[in-house]
Amino acid sequence: MICLVLTIFANLFPSAYSGVNERTFLAVKPDGVQRRLVGEIVRRFERKGFKLVALKLVQASEELLREHYVELREKPFYSRLVKYMSSGPVVAMVWQGLDVVHASRALIGATDPGDAMPGTIRGDFCMEVGKNVIHGSDSVESAHREIALWFREAELLCWEDSAGHWLYE
């Protein structure tokens, strides 16, 4: 029940729903799944201290992907992106924690792996922009939209993280 109230509040007042309760959407793309990188990616987010709220392995439909990447529809690579993302399974996840949207972008690294720093996911595991292993929400607003697109409300687990008091003051 408390999760439902928090989610409704977050959707009505996204700028107020931040801090340790901020959520982001991540998706390990088909190349990351095929290369068996899911565990390593989850490990990095857990070690950072973020809380996993939802995770599922899905074969994303082109319809879902067109909606997900709607802001890129005018780009020349849009059709290739949708085809690539629907070419195999995707691991969709929701993570929660302090400034998780911004921090997850730093963990992921630059979109173009050539610009990604060593130590980031893309810096360590990617060679080219067309196969860059992972998607991460670029803003709190995008995270709300993407989470609602990929997950039903009942799939978002609200649980008490016993390590929280070791992470936050």
From Swiss-Prot:
Membrane topology per record: Peripheral membrane protein
Active-site annotation: H135
CDD domains registered for this protein in UniProt: NDPk_I
Sites where the protein binds ADP: K29, R105, T111, R122, V129, N132
Disulfide cross-links: none
Cofactor: Mg(2+)
InterPro entries assigned: NDK-like_dom (IPR034907), NDK-like_dom_sf (IPR036850), Nucleoside_diP_kinase (IPR001564), Nucleoside_diP_kinase_AS (IPR023005)
Primary localization: mitochondrion
Keyword Membrane carried by entry: yes
Tagged with keyword GTP-binding: no
EC number: 2.7.4.6
Recorded catalytic activity of this chain's protein: a 2'-deoxyribonucleoside 5'-diphosphate + ATP = a 2'-deoxyribonucleoside 5'-triphosphate + ADP; a ribonucleoside 5'-diphosphate + ATP = a ribonucleoside 5'-triphosphate + ADP
Assembly behavior: Homohexamer. Interacts (via its N-terminal region) with KAT5; this interaction enables recruitment of NME3 at DNA damage sites where it plays a role in the repair of DNA. Found in association with several ciliary nephronophthisis proteins, including NEK8, CEP164, ANKS6.
Domain topic, free-text comment: The N-terminal hydrophobic region (1-17) is critical for mitochondrial outer membrane targeting and phosphatidic acid binding.
Name of the protein in question: Nucleoside diphosphate kinase 3
UniProt source species: Mus musculus (Mouse)
